[in-house]
C-alpha cells in the first residue's frame, strides 16, 4: 500500500508544506511495530541450538568488518556516478577500495576455517547454484526492474504529460497505476499461485512478463500516454508477482537451519542491486538526455527565430523559467519540445539497458529448482509463547 499512498502523499506534502509527515508517519509505524515485537514476539531458539553467549563468541566479526568497509565505499562510488564524471576521484577511489575489501571478504569466507561464516560456500554451490544462487540473482534483477520503471515513469509524467510538473494533481493521478499494478501482481500471486504451482516456471513467466513490458517503455514518445500507462501497469504487475515469489524461492534454497543466512544474503543481493540500478539508470538517463539536448536545442531555437549568436546564452538556462523570460514564448516552446525529444532518447537507452539486465534475470529464473515439495502446510518451528512450542527441538 505504501507504493500507492507514498507518491500521492509525498507530492501533496510538498505542495502544502507538510512533507515531513511522510517521514513521521513511517517512523510512528515502525515504532509501533517495534513495541509489538518487543512485547508479543517470542521467537524459537536459534536452529543451531547454540547458547547466546557461545554465539556471541563465535560470530564472524572479521568477515562483518570486511564486508562493511567494502560494501559502503562501493555503494558510495556507485551513487557518486550520478554526480561526478566516471573518471573523477570521488567515483574511482571508493570503487577501488570497495572492490578490494569485498575481495578480501570473499577470500576470508572461502579460506578461513570459521565455525560460522557469514557466507558459507555450500549455500552458493548447492545443486550447482540452482538452490540459492540462481534465485538470489533473479531476486536482484527483479528489484532492478522496479527502479527502471520508478525512474522512467515519473520522468515521462513530469516531462511529457504535466507541463513540466506544473499540473501536479494530474501527475499524482498518473503515478497511481504503478502502485496499483504491484498490488495486483502480489494479490494475484496469493490467489492463483498455489493453484498453478510449478513455482519455478511461475517465477520465470512473471519475470519474462515484467521484462517484456518494461523494455517496451523504449517506445515512449510525447504523445502515447495511454500505451505507456498500459505498459507500466503490465510490467509492474509482473513485478508484484515476481518479487515476492523470488523472495520465497531464494529463502527455500537452503536447509531450515540456514534460513537466517539465506535471508541476509538474498537481502544484500536485492538492495545492492537496487542501488546499482538506480545509479546506472539515473546516470544513463541524465547523460543521454544532456547529449541530445546539446544536439537538438540549438537547431530548434534557431528555427524558432533565435539568432545564432544567442545560442550559447540560451544553453546556460535550458530547463529554467529564464528561457521564456529572456528569449520569448516561441523560442521557449521550441526548446521545451526539443528537451522532450531529448528525454525520449534517454528513456529509450535506459529501457534497453534494463532489457539486458532482464535477460539475465530470465535465465537465472529458468535455472532455479522447483520448490513445490516445500510449498506445503508443514510448520518447522513454533513461537515460544504458543501451545505448540514443546515441539521445537531447541528452546
Q: What is the meaning of each model-derived region?
A:
Residues 2, 180-185, 269, 273:
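MFS transmembrane alpha-helix packing/gate-lining sites
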Residues 27-47, 68-80, 98-113, 362-369:
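C-terminal membrane-cytosol helix-exit motif in multi-pass small-molecule transporters
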Residues 111-257:
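Transmembrane core module of solute transporters
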Amino acid at each position: 500500500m505504501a507504493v500507492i499512498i507514498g507518491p500521492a502523499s509525498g507530492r501533496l506534502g510538498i505542495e502544502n508544506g507538510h512533507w515531513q509527515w511522510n517521514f513521521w508517519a513511517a517512523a510512528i509505524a515502525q515504532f509501533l511495530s517495534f513495541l509489538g515485537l518487543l512485547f508479543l514476539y517470542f521467537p524459537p531458539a536459534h536452529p543451531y541450538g547454540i547458547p547466546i553467549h557461545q554465539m556471541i563468541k563465535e560470530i564472524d566479526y572479521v568477515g562483518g568488518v570486511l564486508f562493511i568497509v567494502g560494501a559502503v565505499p562501493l555503494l558510495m562510488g556507485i551513487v557518486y556516478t550520478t554526480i561526478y564524471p566516471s573518471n573523477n576521484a570521488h567515483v574511482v577511489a571508493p570503487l577501488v577500495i570497495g572492490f578490494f575489501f569485498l575481495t578480501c571478504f570473499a577470500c576470508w569466507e572461502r579460506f578461513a576455517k570459521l565455525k560460522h561464516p557469514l557466507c558459507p560456500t555450500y549455500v552458493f554451490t548447492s545443486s550447482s547454484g540452482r538452490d540459492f544462487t540462481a534465485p538470489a540473482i533473479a531476486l536482484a534483477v527483479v528489484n532492478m526492474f522496479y527502479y527502471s520503471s520508478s525512474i522512467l515513469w515519473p520522468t515521462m509524467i513530469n516531462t511529457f504529460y504535466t507541463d513540466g510538473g506544473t499540473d501536479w494533481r494530474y501527475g499524482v493521478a498518473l503515478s497511481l497505476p504503478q502502485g496499483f499494478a504491484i498490488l495486483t501482481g502480489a494479490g494475484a500471486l496469493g490467489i492463483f499461485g498455489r493453484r498453478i504451482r510449478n513455482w519455478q516456471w511461475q517465477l520465470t513467466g512473471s519475470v519474462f512478463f515484467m521484462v517484456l513490458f518494461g523494455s517496451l517503455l523504449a517506445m515512449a514518445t510525447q504523445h502515447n500516454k495511454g500505451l505507456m500507462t498500459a505498459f507500466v501497469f503490465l510490467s509492474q504487475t509482473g513485478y508484484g508477482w515476481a518479487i515476492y515469489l523470488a523472495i520465497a524461492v531464494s529463502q527455500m534454497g537452503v536447509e531450515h537451519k540456514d534460513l537466517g543466512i539465506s535471508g541476509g544474503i538474498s537481502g544484500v543481493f536485492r538492495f545492492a542491486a537496487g542501488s546499482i540500478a538506480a545509479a546506472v539508470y539515473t546516470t544513463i538517463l541524465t547523460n543521454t538526455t544532456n547529449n541530445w539536448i546539446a544536439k537538438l536545442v540549438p537547431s530548434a531555437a534557431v528555427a524558432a527565430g533565435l539568432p545564432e549568436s544567442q545560442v550559447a546564452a540560451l544553453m546556460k538556462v535550458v530547463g529554467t523559467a529564464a528561457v521564456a523570460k529572456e528569449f520569448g514564448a516561441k523560442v521557449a516552446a521550441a526548446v521545451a519540445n526539443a528537451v522532450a525529444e531529448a528525454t525520449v532518447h534517454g528513456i529509450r537507452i535506459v529501457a534497453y539497458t534494463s532489457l539486458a539486465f532482464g535477460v539475465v534475470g530470465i535465465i537465472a529464473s529458468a535455472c532455479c529448482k522447483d520448490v513445490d515439495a516445500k510449498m506445503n502446510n508443514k510448520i518447522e518451528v513454533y513461537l515460544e509463547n504458543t501451545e505448540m512450542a514443546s515441539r521445537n527441538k531447541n528452546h
